């Protein structure tokens, strides 16, 4: 039988970072030693410092988050207040009535009940009875005065025919006819119209013709004669029997 010698392993100390003999006596002596106790105290001190630094960092981050949330809340509330002010400035006036309507053509709000116009940019009011832009108190005072005099605030549209008296429908049968009947009739003109036109042409004075116009008229007349001479044999072609 063959016997083998096996060496005894050592023990590693995590605090001192050294190897010691792996037996109870060596381990006890090492644990009771001054160096080991100092290393253990240092390790515990480092652990406490790291824990305190971690707690401090957590508290710092928590405080920073609270500041960010508070700043975001203030900014949000400020934005809401600004939006409400803008909506109030650009919206209809808050006078307890809901009769205001936005006129897209002019960009002003109009109240059909009292006839006032409101400009949301400046906050002024306009009325036909006043004739210029005024504040809210002056506008409603004018409306109250106008309502007391029983004068309509909204002007009635004036007809295009002017301010003359209205003409009623004439009695009897209504016959519609054109103002110029000759122009509406289609067809050949009458002999009377032809005679009048011919008389007008005869009464007109002859215009002076230049030499160039005379040459052009002469050339056109010669061309017309040539065309007539060329087409004379063809006249009556379709009247010949086959």
Swiss-Prot record:
A zinc finger (Matrin-type) spans 11-42. Residues 42-71 form a coiled coil. Residues 154-242 are annotated as: Disordered. PROSITE patterns: ZF_MATRIN. It comes from the Eukaryota. The keyword RNA-binding applies. CDD domains: OCRE_ZOP1_plant. It holds the Pfam family OCRE. The keyword Acyltransferase does not apply. GO terms for cellular component: Cajal body; spliceosomal complex. InterPro entries: Matrin/U1-C_Znf_C2H2, Matrin/U1-like-C_Znf_C2H2, OCRE, U1-CZ_Znf_C2H2, WBP4, ZOP1_OCRE. Its main location: nucleus. Component of a pre-mRNA splicing complex. Interacts with STA1. Interacts with PRP31. This is Zinc finger protein ZOP1. It comes from Arabidopsis thaliana (Mouse-ear cress). The lineage of its organism: Eukaryota, Viridiplantae, Streptophyta, Embryophyta, Tracheophyta.
